[in-house]
Amino acid sequence: MNTYLGDKVAIVTAKPQTTRNQISGILSEPSAQVIFVDTPGVHQLRGKMNRMLVQSAWQAMHGADLVLVVLDGDAYLRHPDILDRDLEPLLRAVAQETRPVAVALNKVDLFHDKSRILPLLQQLHEAWPNAEIFPVSALTGEGLPPLLNFIKARLPEAPAQFPEDQLSTVPLRFMAAEIIREKLFISLKQELPYYTAVGIEDWTEDAASGLTPIHAVIHAGRANHQGMALGPAGQQRNGIEHAAQIC
C-alpha cells in the first residue's frame, strides 16, 4: 500500500503482528480511486489481544469489494507448510469467496533463482483456484502494476469518495503515534514491543518554522519494561526519538 501511495501511511517492521488497527490508504488516479484497508494479519496465535486483531481483520474483509491477501514470499519459501499450519482459517475463507480475490506473493526480489517461485505459485493456485496470483516486490515495485490493474478492473463504478490529494482517513496524531510505535518495534528486542503503546499528549503546529513539536508518551506493560525501553542513560529512548523525527 505504501508503495502504491508513494508515502508512508501504514507502518512496517520485520516483526509479526506489527499492525494493530485498520489503516486506510487512498490512491487517486484519473481513471479510478482505490481505497486500500491494511489490516492486522490473520493468524492462529492465542491470547485476547491476538483474537481482537484477527477479528478486526475479518471485519475489514467483510466490507471490501475485493480481497487482497499479501503473503511473505521469503517466509513461505522457508516454511512451505505455512498455509496449512498458520493460515488455515484464511485458506478456507478465501476458497469460499465469491468476490474477486488477488494473492500477492511479496518479497520476490529476494529470490535470486526465480525458478524457485514456480512451486510456490503452483501451490497457491491449488489452494485458491478462485484467486489471481501475483508475484510482487513492495520494495522494488516488481509486479505491482499488473496487480493494480487487476484491482482497478474489478472495482464497482462509483463517484470518488475522497479528494484526490487525500492519502488516508487516519488522523495525523494517530499516524505520528504509529510511526513512534514502528521505531519501538525496530529498536526493542524480543517480545518487549508487544507490551508497549504510544499516546500523543501534545501537538503544537508552528507555522513559522513549519515544524510540529510533539509530546508523546510510551506506555509500558510492566514496570521493568520502562527501564528497558529507556536504555542506559536514556540512550534507547533518544535513538527512537531521532528515528521517528527523520521518518
Q: Where on the chain are the PLM-derived regions?
A:
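Amphipathic helical hotspot of TIR/SEFIR-family domains
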Residues: 79-95, 200-204
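Conserved G1/Walker A P-loop phosphate-binding module
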Residues: 1-71, 212-220
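Canonical P-loop GTPase G-domain recognition
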Residues: 95, 99-102, 109-174
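P-loop NTP-binding site
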Residues: 172-247
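Conserved nucleotide-binding/hydrolysis micro-motifs of P-loop NTPases
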Residues: 16-18, 40-43, 73-77, 108-111, ...
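Conserved, well-folded catalytic cores of nucleic-acid-processing
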Residues: 3, 7, 26-30, 60-67, ...
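Structural beta-sheet core signal
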Residues: 69, 103-105
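Conserved ATPase-coupling elements of RecA-like P-loop NTPase cores
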Residues: 45-49, 53, 76-87, 112-117
